[in-house]
Design a protein with these regions (language model features):
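Conserved NTP-donor binding/palm subdomain of two-metal-ion nucleotidyltransferases/polymerases, i.e.
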Residues: 1-124, 129-356
Length: 356
């Protein structure tokens, strides 16, 4: 992927917003619309707006007034949403605690705690791990009138009915959706099921996972979304702070497990992206960055946007999308043959289910 000038500006605004850089940047007036659109595509509007403000304070270019007012309004909405999500995460934790059920908030609001500027990360939904296994958890939420009966539970999660908060809530009875190749998936789940017990209660009233849990679970999350349709910068920004919150010993131990779980190449690609976008120092990395694989990963980020929502045209026919995904699998082989084979099997089963 050739790094275009606007992408360099976009990266610098992210670094400014996160306090990684103090270097102001000049921005052509015609570039502002594209910068805003990319921040929206990547679900990074809050972080980039923090960067815009710092850039102006450091003597950089001011954006058009109309755009500032629009962006400022959205930034305030993001801050209020984060407060709302924290309150709901605490409520859910208390609900299950009162019934003697162990829970942990995954990703989301736990990641937001790691950001130096609070309230700038855009929340999506609440993922909560509930201990007890699928049968117990599904039965419990059904008996308490919390289950969305219109939706069948998947192998790892079920949605709750929309409550007064209106927040989308996924109850997970497995700590991760897993990996694609069966052996890798089993190793990941076995590790996470044990490590989830090392979670701690944060000052906002909900449990958050350990650094080791986050290193494995969130890399697997990025890996799976990248393999199955795309990933965005927000998830990579999250992983940057997961790494920064870990110790050297934890990173060494995590990398040994990552190799056994078939994610080594994904980790190497991600380290290059974190170096390129967030200026991450080598001492915080899991492994040596791979520029070639990193270019592929970063290219997918800008092609697909947050979670790959823009990767395929919504108007494209179902079977055409299936063909395009198979063409994409050839690219994924470089990231792991076994994982690619596993993903092809998952995708084939998905198509079969759609047809019957």
């Amino acid at each position: 992927m050739r790094m275009e000038k606007d992408y360099s500006i976009f990266f610098q605004l992210i670094r400014l917003g996160l306090g990684i850089s103090d270097e102001a940047v000049g921005i052509p007036m015609e570039a502002w619309k594209g910068l805003y659109k990319e921040a929206e595509r990547q679900s990074m509007l809050g972080v980039v707006f923090e960067g815009v403000n710092r850039n102006v304070n450091l003597g950089g270019t001011k954006p058009p007034t109309a755009l500032v007012l629009k962006w400022m309004g959205i930034s305030q909405v993001i801050k209020r949403k984060n407060v709302k999500f924290d309150v709901e995460a605490k409520r859910l934790t208390q609900l299950f605690d009162e019934n003697g059920i162990f829970t942990v908030i995954l990703k989301g609001q736990g990641n937001e705690l790691l950001y130096p500027v609070r309230g700038c990360r855009i929340p999506g939904d609440i993922d909560i791990f509930v201990d007890g296994g699928k049968d117990f958890v599904v039965d419990w939420i059904d008996r308490h009138g919390l289950a969305d009966r219109a939706e069948k539970a998947t192998y790892h999660h079920v949605h709750l009915l929309p409550g007064a908060s209106g927040i989308d809530i996924e109850v997970h009875f497995l700590p991760s959706s897993g990996l694609f190749f069966p052996t890798h998936r089993h190793r990941l789940q076995r590790f996470l099921q044990s490590e989830v017990r090392n979670s701690v209660m944060c000052d906002r009233g909900f449990r958050i996972p350990s650094a080791m849990f986050n290193l494995l679970m969130q890399l697997a999350h990025i890996h799976c979304h990248f393999f199955s349709g795309g990933i965005g910068l927000r998830q990579m920004n999250d992983f940057y702070y997961v790494l920064m919150s870990s110790s050297k010993d934890e990173r060494v131990e995590a990398m040994a497990l990552i190799r056994k779980m078939g994610m080594r190449n994904t980790a190497a690609a991600l380290m290059w992206v974190l170096k390129e976008v967030f200026f991450m120092d080598a001492e915080w990395m899991l492994c040596s960055p791979d520029e070639s694989l990193g270019n592929v990963l970063l290219g997918e980020v800008f092609k697909g946007g947050n979670f790959g929502h823009y990767l395929f045209d919504n108007e494209e026919a179902f079977f055409l999308k299936a063909v395009l995904r198979r063409k994409r699998f050839l690219k994924l082989l470089r990231f792991g043959v076994l994982e690619t084979i596993g993903q092809m099997w998952f995708d084939t089963m998905y198509i079969v289910k759609k047809l019957i």
